[in-house]
Regions:
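Conserved SAM/SAH cofactor-binding pocket of Class I
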Residues: 118, 122-207
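A structural motif
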Residues: 25-26, 170, 195, 267
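SAM-dependent Rossmann-like transferase core, predominantly class I methyltransferases
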Residues: 70-145
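S-adenosylmethionine
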Residues: 178-286
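Nucleotide donor/acceptor-binding cores
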Residues: 110, 148-149, 243
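A short helix-to-beta-strand connector/capping loop
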Residues: 58, 86, 107-109, 171, ...
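Conserved beta-strand segments of alpha/beta enzyme cores
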Residues: 61, 89, 150, 172, ...
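N-terminal auxiliary segments of SAM/dcSAM-dependent transferases
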Residues: 2-103
Length: 287
């Protein structure tokens, strides 16, 4: 394991947040330093070449993380539990005893542990939290109707959306990401949460070809607009009749391009959720 790091000015925070955190599929951490005008960006990577690519692009430095330093990226922060509706609590502490304690304290909640520093997509970023709320709301309707449902997570990142879908009752769950680091982390988080029957694999959405014989009741696509728009037609084609498409990871200045692309593909008017500079869309296909 290697870590690339760089100290940046506060004025650069938005750029680096968009670069590393917006798609919820990189293992990045941005920390405010004691000097309020400076921040530290860290990206944890399995391969040294991946870290060197970041040096070529941004400068900074690379260190190899020794085994004794694993606590640095696995230790829980003091972040409070993240509540998603009345159904889910997201903790950043993967300790088994901690999870048992939380489950005992909150017997009517589903507990998900996503170590905060292992990858982005822990539930507290606007893109991820909005997706989680929408997925929970839709799944409650399926539960009430006692209907089987399926879920596909495009740009799975930490795997938190796929894990949530499975815990909320989805009978078929798949997730993919173009980043091999994200796949490693998603599989690790699935193990931490003892969730079975989630298929996670490496795939670039540009090369992804949905099967005519398989569709999903819910597809979540947490990806940038410049990746989403060229692929929106085939993503929409993979949504089952009466199914849902949840799009997130879209910056405010790009949301009009998504609306225009969706209209050109004959998609209905979406419900739009805005949180800060991020926009999410919820489309439902007719029967």
């Amino acid at each position: 394991m290697f870590v690339w790091s760089k100290t940046i000015s506060a004025s650069q925070e938005e750029y680096f947040e968009d670069r590393f955190l917006g798609m919820a599929q990189t293992n990045a951490v941005i920390t405010k330093l004691s000097d309020a005008k400076k921040l530290r960006v860290e990206v944890f990577l399995e391969k040294k070449n991946s870290a060197k690519n970041l040096i070529n692009e941004f400068g900074g430095k690379v260190e190899k993380i020794k085994k004794r330093n694993w606590a640095r990226i696995n230790a829980p922060s003091k972040r409070p539990l993240i509540k998603i509706r009345d159904q889910i609590l997201v903790s950043d502490n993967p300790n088994l005893e901690s999870l048992k304690s939380l489950k005992k304290k909150h017997p009517n909640k589903k507990i998900i542990a996503i170590p905060a520093a292992l990858a982005f997509g822990t539930g507290d970023h606007a893109t991820t939290s909005t997706c989680l709320r929408i997925i929970v709301d839709i799944s409650k309707k399926y539960l009430k109707e006692k209907t089987d449902w399926s879920f596909c997570d495009i740009g799975t990142g930490t795997g938190i959306l796929a894990i949530t879908a499975k815990l909320m009752g989805a009978n078929r769950v798949e997730g993919f990401d173009f980043d091999p680091e994200a796949i490693t982390i998603a599989k690790r988080n699935i193990d931490i949460n003892s969730v079975d029957d989630i298929q996670i694999y490496e795939k670039d959405v540009f090369q992804w070809l949905p099967s005519e014989r398989k569709s999903w009741n819910i597809i979540a696509a947490n990806i940038f607009a410049n990746v989403l728009n060229p692929n929106l037609e085939k993503i929409w084609s993979a949504v089952s009749n009466d199914g849902h498409l949840v799009i997130s990871g879209i910056l405010n200045e790009h949301h009009k391009s998504v609306i225009e692309t969706s209209k050109s593909n004959g998609m209905p008017t979406p419900n739009i959720h805005t949180k800060g500079k991020w926009v999410s869309f919820h489309y439902q296909k007719s029967q």
